[in-house]
Design a protein with these regions (language model features):
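Intrinsic-disorder-associated, low-complexity terminal segments enriched in Asp/Asn/His/Tyr and depleted
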Residues: 7-10, 37
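N-terminal amphipathic/hydrophobic targeting modules at extreme N-termini
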Residues: 12, 19-26, 30-31
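N-terminal ligand-binding/catalytic initiation module
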Residues: 28-156, 164, 174, 320, ...
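Adenosine-phosphate binding glycine-rich loop
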Residues: 54-56, 281-374
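Short internal alpha-helix immediately C-terminal to a glycine-rich phosphate-binding loop
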Residues: 158-179, 185-197
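NAD(P)-binding Rossmann-fold cofactor-contacting core
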Residues: 197-220
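Rossmann-like adenosine-cofactor binding region
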Residues: 225-312
Length: 374
C-alpha cells in the first residue's frame, strides 16, 4: 500500500457535552493525550452510536450512497486501503447460518473498520431479516473506537451500489431488460440503483417463496413508479435479459442458473453465498471481474467458489478488479457483444466508506447518541 497522506481526522474525541448528546467533541491528539496521561489527568472517551432508526432518519440519498461506495473503490484502486479477506464463523450447522467478519482501512477517510454480519437463511420464520450487521469504526492511529452503527441497511445499500457501479462500467449502455433472482434486503437496492442508471423497459424478479417475490415486486413497482414483472421460475427471469443479478439465498450449492439462458452481450452479477451457477458459466464469458482478488481467491463460500477451486477463475483468467476499472487503469466493456461476469463478495471498504458518510451526516443533523467508552 502506498504511504498515506497525513490526516488529522476528528476521530479520538473527548466529550465536551453531556452523555447522550452529539454535540461537538474536544479532540486530543495522541501526543497531547499521552502527556495528559503522564500528568495523571483522566481522559473521558465517548463514541457515537447510530441505531437502526437513526440510520433510517438520515434518509441517505441515492447520490450519497453511490458517492460513498465509489469513493471507496477509488481509494482501493489508488492503493490507499488495506483489505483483510473476510473470515467466517459457523456456530452450529443445525442453525443454518453463519457470521461474516469484514475488516479494512481507508486512508483518505482516516478510519479503520470491522463489520460483523449474521447470515441466517431461515430467519424469515421468526419474522427477522436474514442479514443483520454491526459496524465498528476506529481511529487507525490509536485503536480507539469512533462509532458503532447498525449496519443492516449499510450492508443492503452498499451491496446495491456495488452492483450498480459495476453495471455502469460493464453492462451495455442500452441495457433495457433486468432479470433479478432473489428478494433479500440488498435486492431492493440492486434494482433501485440499477434502474437509476439504465431506466429499464422491463424488470423481472423471482425468488423461491411466492409471498416473498410478490411483496418484492409490489415494493419495487410502488417505489420506481413502473411495472415490475414477477415470474415463477429462474429461466423466465434470466433468459434474454441484458443484465442478470443472482442474489439467491440457497441452503447449499445448486446449479439453478443455466449457462444456456445467458444472452450474448449480457452482464451477469452473481453474489449468492451458496453458488447457483453451473461450472460452464465462465466458458461463455469474455471478461471476469471481481471486487477484490485477494478476498475471492480463498474461503468456503461464494457464487464462484467452485470455479476458483476448479481453476476456471484464476489470476491469469481474471480481467480486473472493479477498482482498477473505476480509476481507468483497466478497461471495462469495450464491445457491445462482450459477455461479462462481475462477482462481488462484499468489500469492507464499502461498509467503512458508507458508514463514515452516515456518521458525518449524523453529526451535521444531530442524530445519534454519544456513549461513554472510557
Amino acid at each position: 500500500m502506498r504511504e498515506p497522506r497525513e490526516h488529522r481526522p476528528d476521530l479520538m474525541s473527548v466529550a465536551a457535552s453531556r452523555p447522550g448528546t452529539l454535540a461537538g467533541p474536544v479532540v486530543f491528539w495522541a501526543g497531547e493525550r499521552a502527556r495528559r496521561h503522564q500528568r495523571g489527568a483522566a481522559v473521558t472517551v465517548h463514541f457515537t452510536y447510530l441505531s437502526g432508526p437513526d440510520v433510517d432518519a438520515l434518509a441517505m440519498t441515492d447520490e450519497e450512497i453511490l458517492g460513498a461506495v465509489e469513493g471507496g473503490l477509488v481509494a482501493q484502486g489508488r492503493g490507499q486501503t488495506v483489505i483483510e479477506p473476510r473470515v467466517h464463523l459457523v456456530p452450529d450447522p443445525a442453525y443454518r447460518g453463519h457470521f461474516n467478519v469484514l475488516r479494512g482501512y481507508v486512508a483518505p477517510l482516516g478510519v479503520a473498520g470491522m463489520k460483523i454480519v449474521g447470515d441466517y437463511v431461515d430467519n424469515y420464520l421468526h419474522g427477522l431479516p436474514s442479514e443483520m450487521a454491526l459496524l465498528n469504526l476506529f481511529d487507525p492511529r490509536t485503536g480507539m473506537p469512533v462509532a458503532l452503527l447498525n449496519a443492516t441497511a449499510i450492508t443492503d445499500m452498499r451491496t446495491g451500489a456495488m452492483t450498480a457501479l459495476g453495471a455502469r462500467h460493464l453492462a451495455r449502455r442500452e441495457s433495457r431488460i433486468l432479470g433479478h433472482v432473489g428478494a433479500r434486503g440488498s435486492s431492493y437496492w440492486n434494482v433501485r440503483l440499477l434502474d437509476r442508471f439504465f431506466r429499464f423497459a422491463e424488470i423481472r424478479v423471482h425468488s423461491r417463496r411466492p409471498e416473498s417475490r410478490w411483496a418484492f415486486g409490489e415494493h419495487l413497482a410502488r417505489d420506481l413508479g413502473k411495472p415490475v414483472r414477477v415470474v415463477d421460475d429462474w429461466e423466465t427471469c434470466v433468459r434474454g435479459a441484458d443484465i442478470v443479478v443472482e442474489a439467491s439465498r440457497l441452503p447449499e450449492p445448486a446449479p439453478l442458473l443455466r449457462t444456456e439462458w445467458i444472452a450474448k452481450g449480457a452482464l451477469v452479477v452473481p453474489y449468492g453465498t451458496m453458488s447457483a451457477l453451473e461450472l460452464s458459466l465462465t466458458d461463455v464469458m469474455d471478461k471476469l471481474v471481481v471486487d477484490d482478488w485477494g478476498q475471492v481467491r480463498a474461503g468456503r463460500f461464494g457464487a464462484l467458489r467452485a470455479h476458483v477451486d476448479a481453476g476456471r477463475l484464476t489470476e491469469a483468467t481474471l480481467h480486473a478488479e472493479l477498482c482498477q476499472i473505476v480509476i481507468g487503469d483497466r478497461p471495462g466493456r469495450e464491445r457491445e457483444d462482450e459477455t461479462i461476469l462481475f462477482w462481488h463478495r462484499g468489500l469492507s471498504l464499502s461498509d467503512i466508506a458508507l458508514g463514515h458518510a452516515m456518521l458525518e451526516k449524523a453529526r451535521r443533523l444531530g442524530i445519534g447518541q454519544s456513549l461513554r467508552y472510557a
